UniProtKB/Swiss-Prot annotation:
Feature: compositional bias, Polar residues: 37-55
Record's function text: May act as a substrate-specific adapter of an E3 ubiquitin-protein ligase complex (CUL3-RBX1-BTB) which mediates the ubiquitination and subsequent proteasomal degradation of target proteins.
Entry's free-text remark on domains: The BTB/POZ domain mediates the interaction with some component of ubiquitin ligase complexes.
Protein name per the record: BTB/POZ domain-containing protein At2g13690
Biased segments, Low complexity type: 93-103
GO BP, sorted A to Z: protein ubiquitination
InterPro entries to which the protein is assigned, alphabetical: BTB/POZ_dom_prot
Pathway the protein acts in: Protein modification; protein ubiquitination
Region feature Disordered, mapped onto this chain: 34-66, 82-111
Keywords on record: Ubl conjugation pathway
Residue intervals of the BTB domain: 142-225
Length: 544
């Protein structure tokens, strides 16, 4: 032990241990006390200067540096291993050795960051994508460079490919390669690498074009599996590119896939447009074309519509009848989303079905007026309600097709039905007024333009039954908007000649004064009629 050590071992001469420890750290030439921390320092200090100079700088993360770091960790006093956020009670002031180790560790971390960041920079740099060739017998090098330029500056994509594969799969690329080889003799004489360069401009979708080229390196059975992964919409895009570059294997595989899977309406329209642009082999595309409509189905549409209408009107079950009504109405109406230049529906078939429903309704009313048994009342009501629903359903189709004018005339001539209306029970007869209410609504909204004779016949026949049944209609609306019924009745009455308006409005006034809310409220139309008939008449006579 040296003299410096003996001097440091005399804490009692100074009174406290704190002063002796403070003295040991204040003196830069003093030797610290023996401890696990100072062993490495003493061993370091005894290393010759020559060996220190010849010691090479260790590369971070090398086995040698890891070993030295492990030795340092083993020499650390267990008391110095603290949890994060705690302050050590020992050696609160940093020592020279600690500072050196900290600087060395920081340098190693900086070097590690530099080394680790290098591969990231390389991976982010642009490299032309290559298509791997497996099992084709080709050399590992690529002798063709395909440059794809997107439409309207949509980017550039460069593919390094095999010249033999391109020429074998695409007739278009085969011709371009043949032209390029004619011009390659000059570059070969200059010692340049003989690489065929092909450029395709105005590419709509670079990703689809690349997927199509990648299929050249696959077997035919694998190509179909690729299409199954893509889906129908993407497969149609690939089919368009394959047809453009005359890649027959992909075209045949795609057509085979499309024929075997269902399509959405958007996919069907897209495929229909593509088949109209490119000409495909008849044998390959015949099964797909068979799924589209043909002339035979177009000729059968008229008779099919007739069969559907008659099937619905004769259906006795309520739930399927209502479901089919909604379906067929959506198909036959002009505003239908299914309409694709469909021909006009046969007007006579609709009118024939409507006339048949009206005749059935008249027979049911005759049966109800002559029947005295209460057992038949419930089936009779159900039958009458079904026929009324059929008439209203056909009327909606007629109104949408703008062919309802003649039906209004037919309904206004049902004198026999009007006569039986008075003899039938109110809970049965009000169903008929639902048809009259629907006609009044359509006329009030100007969706049906009838002649004066047809309007007069409708009001003459069905205005009084509407007054009688209005209370029942209010209680059993069945989808009928009573406000619209009142508005439609008032507007229709105002289209009649003034003399006829006088008789109708006076009749309404008497009914409304007796029955009140059980009668339709035509006050607004009555005021208009009053002003037209009297006030404006006085003004016109004064002007004369």
């Amino acid at each position: 032990m040296t003299m410096g050590d003996s001097d440091l071992r005399k804490p009692t001469n100074f009174g406290t241990g704190h002063l002796s420890r403070r003295r040991s750290w204040c003196c830069s030439f003093a030797v610290p006390p023996a401890s696990p921390d100072t062993r490495s320092i003493s061993s370091r200090n005894h290393i010759p200067a020559k060996s220190q100079q010849q010691r090479p700088k260790l590369v971070p993360c090398s086995p040698q540096s890891s070993k030295s770091a492990l030795n340092i960790v083993n020499r650390i006093d267990p008391r110095r291993i603290l949890s994060p956020g705690r302050v050590s009670p020992i050696d609160s002031d940093p020592t020279v050795t600690t500072m050196q180790e900290t600087e060395t560790t920081q340098e190693e971390e900086d070097d590690a960051v530099v080394v680790d960041s290098t591969p990231n920079l390389r991976s982010e740099s642009f490299r032309a994508p290559k298509i791997e060739v497996t099992g084709s017998g080709l050399s590992e090098g690529y002798d063709a460079r395909l440059s794809l330029k997107g439409r309207n500056g949509g980017g550039v994509l460069v593919l390094e490919l095999s010249l033999e594969v391109l020429a074998a799969n695409s007739d278009v690329f085969s011709g371009l390669i043949a032209e390029e080889k004619k011009c390659s003799s000059s570059s070969s004489s200059l010692g340049l690498k003989n690489t065929c360069r092909i450029e395709v401009c105005d590419v709509e979708n670079l990703g689809v074009f690349r997927e199509t080229v990648e299929l050249m390196f696959e077997e035919s059975n694998v190509i179909i599996k690729k299409f199954m992964t893509m889906g129908v919409y993407r497969a149609i895009d690939v089919l368009e590119v394959a047809a453009g570059i005359k890649f027959s294997r992909a075209v045949l595989s795609c057509l085979k896939y499309l024929e075997a899977v269902p399509w959405t309406e958007d996919e069907e329209e897209k495929l229909r447009r593509l088949l109209g642009i490119y000409s495909f082999d008849d044998d390959a595309v015949s099964e797909i074309l068979a799924r589209f409509n043909s002339n035979e189905t177009e000729n059968l549409q008229d008779s099919l519509s007739k069969k559907l209408v008659w099937s619905i009107t004769s259906c006795s079950d309520v739930n399927p009848r209502n479901e089919l009504k909604s379906l067929v109405k959506g198909l036959l109406c002009k505003s239908s989303v299914y309409e694709k230049e469909q021909p006009e529906i046969n007007k006579e078939d609709i009118y024939r079905a409507g006339k048949c429903c009206v005749d059935s309704l008249a027979k049911l009313f005759e049966e109800g007026s002559s029947s005295s048994s209460s057992k038949k009342e419930k089936p009779l009501i159900e039958s009458i309600s079904r026929e009324v629903e059929n008439i209203n359903w056909l009327l909606e189709i007629m109104i949408d097709r703008e062919i309802a004018e003649e039906f209004v005339e037919i309904w206004g001539k049902q004198r026999r039905l009007v006569e039986m209306h008075e003899r039938v029970s109110p809970m049965v007869r009000y169903e008929v007024s639902r048809v009259t209410g629907a006609i009044f609504i359509a006329m009030g909204k100007r969706r049906v333009q009838c002649g004066g004779e047809a309007r007069a016949g409708l009001v003459e026949a069905w205005f009084k039954p509407m007054l009688v049944d209005f209370g029942w209609l209010q209680r059993c609306k069945k989808g009928l908007d009573m406000r619209e019924v009142e508005e439609g009745m008032g507007q229709t009455l105002l289209t009649l000649p003034v003399k006829e308006q006088y008789q109708v409005f006076m009749e309404w006034f008497r009914w409304f004064s007796k029955h009140g809310t059980e009668c339709p409220n035509l006050s607004k139309a009555f005021q208009i009629w009053w002003r037209r008939s009297f006030l404006r008449g006085v003004e016109s006579s004064t002007c004369r």
